[in-house]
Every structure is written in C-alpha cells, then in structure tokens.
Amino acid sequence: GGYTSTYENISISLPDNVSSYDTLEVFHEHACEDRRNRYAKSEGGYGGCHEWDYLAYMKICDRDNASKCGTEFMRWITTYGRGGRWLTDITPYLFMLQDNDVRNFKYQGANKGTMTVKLLFSDWDVGERSFSGEKMFDDGGQFAGEYNNESRYNRQHNFTALSNYHSVKIVSTITGHGFNQDQANCAEFCDHEHHYFLNGNTAYEWHPIVYDNQGCEKEVDRGVVANQFGSWPYGRAGWCAGQDVKQWTYDITDWVDNSTTNNLRYKGLFNGQEYSPQDTNGGDRRIRANILLVWYAQN
C-alpha cells in the first residue's frame, strides 16, 4: 500500500494479573517478503524488503467502541531495504490496559511482510505504576511559522491534580518529517525543541543527533537496524530509519499545584525561538507529536 495506508486489526485477550506488573514492553518483528533484504529479480523488478523508510503505528481502540482506534500505542520507522526487530519500553502506557481486558488494536503501515507484535509484562519493583493518563495538545502540525499559533492548534492544557497520586509525568512521542523545503531543512533534519511551561517551571526535549551524519549509525545500540541501504546513518529529529520511536518522559510532580487548576503550556521552537522558514519552496514539514500527562501511584 501507499503511505501508512495498510491496516491490520487484531483483538487481544489480556490475563487477569496485568495490574500486578510494573513494566510493559512491546516486541515487534517486521519480516519482509521471502525474509530477504531487497534484491533485484532475474526476471526484472525487486523482491525482498521495501526500498524506503516509512512510518508505522500500532493504535489501541477505545474500550467502549472497538471501531474507534485513534489512540497511539506504538510508533516505528521502517528500514531501507531490510527487515527489523525491536523491543520498546512503553511502561507509561500501562494505565491503558486492565485485568481481563479484551482490547482491539490497529496496525497501520505502508509495507507488506509478516508482522509480529507481542506485549511483554514484567515486574522490576520500580515502586510506581501508571493508573491514569490524558492526551494533551494537538497532534503536532506543520512546522512552518504558525506551529504555536493557538488559533490553529491547541497548545494549552488545564488539569487538576488527582487524589492519592505519587508522581505525574509528561510522556511524549515526537518525530519531525519533511526536508529540502527550507534553509534549515525542517522538520526532519533540523533540531526543533519542544518546551513545556507550568507554574514558573520549564523543561524541553531536543534532538542533538540531527546534525551528525553518523547520528543514527551511533544509535545501533538503541535499536537502529545496521547496514541498511540509503541514507540511514544520518541523524534525524526524534527518529532513525529502522528504529522504534522512543518515548521522552519528564517528571513534573514538583511543578504541580495540588490546590488549584494547573495550566500546562507547550511550544515547538527552533534555536529557542519561534520558527519562521527561510528560502521556503512550500512543501510539507510536519511534526508528529503524541503528548500525554500520565499519573502514577505507589506500587
């Protein structure tokens, strides 16, 4: 299929002891046709793996409406011309699953092959476990001069502290896509920053590998599939070809005012400032952002 146009639906029955675990990982194998790297066929054309890197998602469907599957659960970027296997820690999302749950998931991607996905639960005595979460802000947007325009995008989130919580954290999954559209090469090859502001406090996520031509090659120990074809070694903003997209987590427990409504604000910046593209030729420079506020209880 085309760009993230292929879907596969699956229903998973969870055991009766999910709540006893404090760690959640996802194993995913993307095995290409013939389980071979991309190759030229003698009769013409190509076999084996797909040529290009593409986004792939696994989304969890609503508990009360299995046909509504808009909540992101996992994100990957496929390889250039090879298969891949990844093990990803998404422990903050434990709150989405309950004992004896029967949940539907939708896998969304662009490349054919055999897809294996497993949920792995374990207990590491980490001392806390997520029990609630809420989506914040819009899903990124065009990084083209109006990313922080609140008449176009929701960039504020009001919340009140839940009772009996132990900690609360920002959990984000952010990647930038599109290049050769402006002087800074946004949003795939520019280091956009993602800033959060609450009650006089601030923190931000950034992507320092984007200017390193071996940035993704250096990420092999963190899951990047090595020896791909194409430009896979180049560092990107929040991702690498042939890698699971990692969550960014930041503890804001000490920022929260438990006695009143809290207003958490978000901005996407470039070099600490509002981004205005220079020498632009139009095109797409999109940031894909999934940002949650996740609450934890002592475990």
Task: Label each region the model flagged.
Residues 1-299:
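Extracellular/secretory-pathway and virion-surface proteins
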